[in-house]
C-alpha cells in the first residue's frame, strides 16, 4: 500500500510538472503520456488489490483504468512515431497532443489551428451550426505520417488521405438532423457557398459536388461551378465582412454561472494569473457572498491540482470534490470550486499558486450558507 502510494505521488507530480512546464517539445509530451500510463497502471493494481482509496483519491474501476491506460499507450506510440519524422521540430503543445483532440473528427489524427465555419440550415442564420476546419492534419498513411490541410465544399469538410478525398463532416447528414428542406449554406471568413432554392435534394447525386475548396493554410480559394440537374449552378460569393458568431457575441452563461450569479465573459491579460488562458468574472450576486474560483478542465487534472493545493491550505477556506453538469453531454469537462474568506485571500492564491494553462479559471461569488 505504501509503495503504491509513493509511486502514485511521484507519477502525479511528474504529470503536474508537465502541465506547469507547458512545453512545446514533442519529447516532453511523450514523457507526459508515459506518466499517465503509469498512473493508471498503478490505479489498476490498487483496484485489483481491493484498494478503493489511494492518496485520498478514489481509485477508478478496472474498466476505466484499462481504457485510460490504453489511450495513453496509443498516444505515446503515435507521438513516438511522429518524433521520428521531419515534424518533430515543429511546436507541439499539450492541447495539440491531448486525447480529446486525438479522438475528434477526423479521428486518430493530430490536428492544429482549427478555424470555425458556419453552416446555415434551411437558409436560416438562426438555425446554424459551427464546424472546425483544421489548418494542419497529421495522419498515418501508407507512406508514413503525412501533413495536409482541410478543405471545404458544398458536400462537407474533408482532407486528402493518401490522395483520396476523405470527408469527416457530411453536411447532408447534418441537414437531416438540424434542417427540414435538405438545403444549407456554408459561410466561411470571407466567402460563402450557396445552393439555389430550386435545387432538389435528390439532384445532388446526379453530378459531382461543387468543387469550392478553401485551403486554410494559405487562404487560397479555387472555384469551379458544378451543374445541378434542373437548376442553375451553385453560387459562391464573397462577403464584405465577417459576421460575428453567436458564440462570440453572446456567450452562454448558463454553464458558467453558479449560486445565482450572473456570468459575464471577460478576458483578463496577466492580471491575477498570467497562466490562465481565460478568466470569467461573476458579479451581481447577493450581499452575503463569499469569493470563489471555479477550475474547469479534465477530471484527473483537477484531482492532481486539488492534491497539490494541500500545500497552500492557508490560502483558501475550502475546496470541493470534482463535479460536472448533468444536463450536458460533455462529461469529460469537470469542475472544482475553491472558497475564500475574502477577495484579498483569493488574489494571494492566484499570485502564489501556479495553475496549469489547460485548466480554465473562473472567478465568482457564491451565496454564503
Swiss-Prot record:
Protein name: Regulatory protein E2
Translocase listed as a keyword: no
Region of interest (DNA-binding domain), ranges: 289-369
Post-translational modification: Phosphorylated.
Residue ranges, annotated region (Disordered): 230-257
Sequence ranges of Basic and acidic residues compositional bias: 245-257
Family: Belongs to the papillomaviridae E2 protein family.
Entry's Gene Ontology molecular function annotations: DNA binding; DNA-binding transcription factor activity; nucleotide binding
Presence of the UniProt keyword Phosphoprotein in the record: yes
Region (Transactivation domain) residue spans: 1-200
Gene that produces this protein: E2
Main localization of the protein described in the UniProt heading: host cell
GO cellular component terms, semicolon-separated: host cell nucleus
Annotated keywords: Activator, DNA replication, DNA-binding, Early protein, Host nucleus, Isopeptide bond, Phosphoprotein, Repressor, Transcription, Transcription regulation, Ubl conjugation
Compartment list: Host nucleus
Amino acid at each position: 500500500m505504501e509503495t503504491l502510494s509513493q509511486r502514485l505521488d511521484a507519477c502525479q507530480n511528474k504529470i503536474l510538472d508537465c502541465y506547469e512546464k507547458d512545453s512545446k517539445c514533442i519529447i516532453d509530451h511523450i514523457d507526459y503520456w508515459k506518466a499517465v500510463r503509469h498512473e493508471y497502471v498503478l490505479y489498476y493494481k490498487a483496484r485489483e488489490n481491493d484498494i478503493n482509496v489511494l492518496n485520498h483519491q478514489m481509485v477508478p474501476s478496472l474498466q476505466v483504468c484499462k481504457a485510460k491506460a490504453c489511450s495513453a499507450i496509443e498516444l505515446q506510440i503515435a507521438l513516438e512515431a511522429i518524433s521520428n519524422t521531419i515534424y518533430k521540430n515543429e511546436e507541439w503543445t499539450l492541447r495539440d497532443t491531448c486525447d480529446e483532440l486525438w479522438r475528434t473528427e477526423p479521428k486518430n489524427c493530430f490536428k492544429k489551428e482549427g478555424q470555425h465555419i458556419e453552416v446555415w440550415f434551411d437558409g436560416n442564420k438562426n438555425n446554424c451550426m459551427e464546424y472546425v476546419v483544421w489548418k494542419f492534419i497529421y495522419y498515418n498513411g501508407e507512406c508514413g505520417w503525412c501533413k495536409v490541410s482541410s478543405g471545404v465544399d458544398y458536400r462537407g469538410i474533408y482532407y486528402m488521405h493518401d490522395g483520396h478525398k476523405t470527408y469527416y463532416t457530411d453536411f447532408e447528414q447534418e441537414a437531416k438532423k438540424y434542417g427540414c428542406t435538405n438545403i444549407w449554406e456554408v459561410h466561411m471568413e470571407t466567402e460563402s457557398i450557396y445552393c439555389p432554392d430550386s435545387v432538389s435534394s435528390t439532384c445532388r447525386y446526379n453530378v459531382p459536388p461543387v468543387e469550392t475548396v478553401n485551403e486554410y493554410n494559405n487562404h487560397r480559394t479555387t472555384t469551379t461551378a458544378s451543374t445541378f440537374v434542373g437548376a442553375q449552378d451553385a453560387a459562391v460569393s464573397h462577403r464584405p465582412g465577417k459576421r460575428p458568431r453567436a458564440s462570440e457575441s453572446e456567450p452562454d452563461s448558463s454553464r458558467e454561472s453558479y449560486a445565482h450569479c450572473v456570468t459575464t465573459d471577460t478576458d483578463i491579460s496577466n492580471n491575477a494569473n498570467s497562466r490562465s488562458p481565460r478568466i470569467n468574472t461573476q458579479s451581481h450576486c447577493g450581499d452575503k457572498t463569499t469569493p470563489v474560483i471555479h477550475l474547469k478542465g479534465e477530471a484527473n487534472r483537477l484531482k492532481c491540482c486539488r492534491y497539490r493545493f494541500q500545500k497552500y491550505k492557508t490560502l483558501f477556506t475550502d475546496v470541493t470534490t470534482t463535479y460536472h453538469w448533468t444536463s450536458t453531454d460533455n462529461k469529460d469537462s469537470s469542475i472544482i470550486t475553491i472558497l475564500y474568506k475574502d477577495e484579498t485571500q483569493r488574489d494571494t492564491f492566484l499570485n502564489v499558486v501556479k495553475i496549469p494553462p489547460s485548466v480554465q479559471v473562473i472567478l465568482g461569488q457564491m451565496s454564503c450558507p
